[in-house]
């Protein structure tokens, strides 16, 4: 439909202030280095507040005590969130031990937060510890460059322990894509690692002086698992194998979930199929997609700046043709692929070379020593003896990967002793939330702190209707920016106000359909009342193997979203 009325390739008009900031920043330096030495405030001032995002950090404060501090005439309790760049979520046990120590010694909350972007975050880093965290990461071969703001963010890769050989190849491509699309500015090394300034002019051959119009997310996905939720991402490489070997990728472009409440110019969108490419064209095509979005993306309105809106404005075929022109290739027809699920298989799975992989369920990805549940200590003890690696999944879980038969019993014993293998029901395994309160400045309603007890109540509803071992893919996100990926869930809750959510129904288990808003601005008891009725019908009327989301569509409870740019809000 979008091909019939293509819009302008470049949106004319007054540029946003973010564009001015990027030009003025001297390739992302700003005055961050000077600001670090200002002890009068715990935060970063002016442009630096936003510029630190390009260096992988967000300035936050503890919203639980914001009003109390204001009464005391104190500034908010500023602290930084730092997000590591970790393509494919792979981290060595040596690196894990370093981040465990930093979290314990130098953050307010003492936790490691696994995210659905397949990396980890530190919350609560005081300004005095900001430079040390970057130096600690560098000392173990990690960094936080380009994990936030208008760049290609952390590249995801299916954490598939079944296809170990294919995973190894796909993971290498995730790393290559991440490295290829990194900014070239030396600002990160100069500010955080004390590297000397070089008397040359910075050049950004791919990203340009003003970087991208908005955040940009990339995945490498191995069917039939859609664990990385490709339709939440701008650019997706779907692995195509022949005889167990990776031969190329299907490219899908223009997914994204972020919306604004009540703004009908915003919508969630699934990614569009562009075609198949052999492996040798991967980096050229990745660069071509990014530079096309760089040049054509809307820099006059950040709420309309993501790749999904560019595709709808110029037309999918026009965008695709430009990618072909820039990359010097012609897309081949899409090769057959299918997604059957996206959850992690909790427990032991045998891979190649007689190595085992243990997937541990980590509720909400929050790793901390709780009373009677010493999760953080348990993982540290495993890291001390495990010779393989850890893999963070896009479902916020953790895989102890590459365990030899001789170590299996020892690692399982440690996991069990530290409550890391306490069994949970399928509903809890298939539920996810973003961080939200108390640290996220955008939060409108609780998410991470709300989900565990809400899941208890959903489990009770399933049990009441005789299906205690069933599950609904359930996501809670504290605001419509959508970090919790609620707009690809069978049941998605989007925070509207404290204690109130918009309820979306009609996604599916494989994550290929956007759910539609079913009820607006309702409370937890109202959500559970609705769910009681809907689950009762699902239990009685469903067809064999029919998931909750598919049932709500087939039964006419909700209309499917078929063309989001036009029917998402209907």
Curated annotation (Swiss-Prot):
InterPro entries: CysI, NiRdtase/SiRdtase_haem-b_fer, Nit/Sulf_reduc_fer-like_dom_sf, NO2/SO3_Rdtase_4Fe4S_dom, NO2/SO3_Rdtase_4Fe4S_prot, NO2/SO3_Rdtase_4Fe4S_sf, NO2/SO3_Rdtase_FeS/sirohaem_BS. Siroheme binds at residue 483. The lineage of its organism: Bacteria, Pseudomonadati, Pseudomonadota, Gammaproteobacteria, Enterobacterales. It catalyses: hydrogen sulfide + 3 NADP(+) + 3 H2O = sulfite + 3 NADPH + 4 H(+). Its EC number is 1.8.1.2. One of its GO terms (cellular component) is sulfite reductase complex (NADPH). Component of the sulfite reductase complex that catalyzes the 6-electron reduction of sulfite to sulfide. This is one of several activities required for the biosynthesis of L-cysteine from sulfate. GO terms for biological process: cysteine biosynthetic process; hydrogen sulfide biosynthetic process; sulfate assimilation. Pathway: Sulfur metabolism; hydrogen sulfide biosynthesis; hydrogen sulfide from sulfite (NADPH route): step 1/1. Binds 1 siroheme per subunit. Binds 1 [4Fe-4S] cluster per subunit. It comes from Enterobacter sp. (strain 638). Belongs to the nitrite and sulfite reductase 4Fe-4S domain family. Alpha(8)-beta(8). The alpha component is a flavoprotein, the beta component is a hemoprotein. It holds the Pfam family NIR_SIR. [4Fe-4S] cluster binds at residues 434, 440, 479, 483. It comes from the Bacteria. GO terms for molecular function: 4 iron, 4 sulfur cluster binding; heme binding; metal ion binding; NADP binding; sulfite reductase (ferredoxin) activity; sulfite reductase (NADPH) activity. Keywords: 4Fe-4S, Amino-acid biosynthesis, Cysteine biosynthesis, Heme, Iron, Iron-sulfur, Metal-binding, NADP, Oxidoreductase. Its cofactor is siroheme; [4Fe-4S] cluster. This is Sulfite reductase [NADPH] hemoprotein beta-component.
């Amino acid at each position: 439909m979008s091909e019939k009325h293509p819009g302008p390739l470049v949106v004319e008009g007054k540029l946003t202030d973010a564009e001015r900031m990027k030009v003025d920043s001297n390739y992302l330096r700003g005055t961050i280095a000077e600001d670090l030495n200002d002890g009068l405030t715990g935060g970063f001032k002016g442009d630096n507040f936003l510029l630190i995002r390009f260096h992988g950090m967000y300035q936050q404060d503890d919203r639980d005590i914001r009003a109390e501090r204001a009464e005391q005439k104190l500034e908010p309790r500023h602290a930084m969130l730092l997000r590591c760049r970790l393509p494919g979520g792979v981290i060595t046990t040596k690196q894990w031990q370093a981040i465990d120590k930093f979290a314990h010694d130098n953050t307010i909350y003492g936790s490691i937060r696994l995210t659905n972007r397949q990396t980890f975050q530190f919350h609560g880093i005081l300004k005095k510890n900001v430079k040390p965290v970057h130096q600690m990461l560098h000392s173990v071969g990690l960094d936080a460059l380009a994990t936030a703001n208008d760049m290609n963010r952390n590249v995801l890769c299916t954490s598939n322990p079944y296809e170990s050989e294919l995973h190894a190849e796909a993971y290498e491509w995730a790393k290559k894509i991440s490295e290829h699309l990194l900014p070239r500015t030396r600002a990160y090394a100069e500010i955080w690692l004390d590297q000397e300034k070089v008397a040359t002019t910075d050049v950004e051959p791919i990203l340009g002086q003003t970087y991208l119009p908005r955040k940009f997310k990339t995945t490498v996905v191995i069917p039939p698992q859609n664990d990385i939720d490709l339709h939440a991402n701008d650019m997706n490489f779907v692995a195509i194998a022949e005889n167990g070997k990776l031969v190329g990728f299907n490219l899908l472009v223009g997914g994204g979930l972020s919306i604004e409440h009540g703004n009908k110019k915003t919508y969630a969108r699934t990614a569009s199929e562009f075609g198949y490419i052999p492996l040798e064209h991967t980096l050229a095509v990745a660069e071509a997609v990014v530079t096309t979005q760089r040049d054509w993306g809307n820099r006059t309105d950040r709420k309309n700046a993501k790749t999904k809106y560019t595709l709808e404005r110029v037309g999918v075929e026009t965008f695709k043709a430009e990618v072909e022109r820039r990359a010097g290739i012609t897309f081949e027809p899409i090769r057959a692929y299918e997604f059957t699920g996206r959850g992690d298989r909790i427990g032991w799975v045998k891979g190649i070379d007689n190595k085992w992989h243990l997937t541990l369920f980590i509720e909400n990805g929050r790793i901390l020593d709780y009373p009677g549940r010493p999760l953080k200590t348990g993982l540290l003890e495993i890291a001390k003896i495990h010779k393989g690696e850890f893999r963070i999944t896009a479902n916020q879980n953790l895989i102890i990967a590459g365990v030899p038969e001789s170590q299996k019993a020892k690692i399982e014993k440690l996991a069990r002793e530290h409550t890391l293998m306490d069994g949970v029901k399928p509903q809890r395994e298939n539920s996810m939330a973003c961080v939200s309160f108390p640290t996220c400045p955008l939060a409108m309603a609780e998410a991470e702190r709300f989900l565990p007890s809400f899941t208890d109540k959903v489990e009770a509803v399933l049990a009441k209707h005789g299906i205690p071992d069933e599950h609904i893919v359930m996501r809670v996100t504290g605001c419509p920016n959508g970090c919790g990926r609620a707009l690809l869930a069978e049941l998605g809750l989007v925070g509207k106000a404290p204690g109130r959510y918009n309820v979306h129904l009609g996604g599916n288990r494989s994550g290929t359909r956007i759910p539609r808003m079913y009820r607006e601005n309702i409370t937890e008891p109202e959500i559970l009342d609705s769910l009681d009725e809907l689950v009762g019908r699902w239990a009685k009327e469903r067809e064999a193997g029919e998931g909750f989301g598919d049932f709500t569509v087939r039964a006419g409870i909700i209309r499917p979203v078929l063309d989001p740019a036009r029917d998402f809000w209907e």
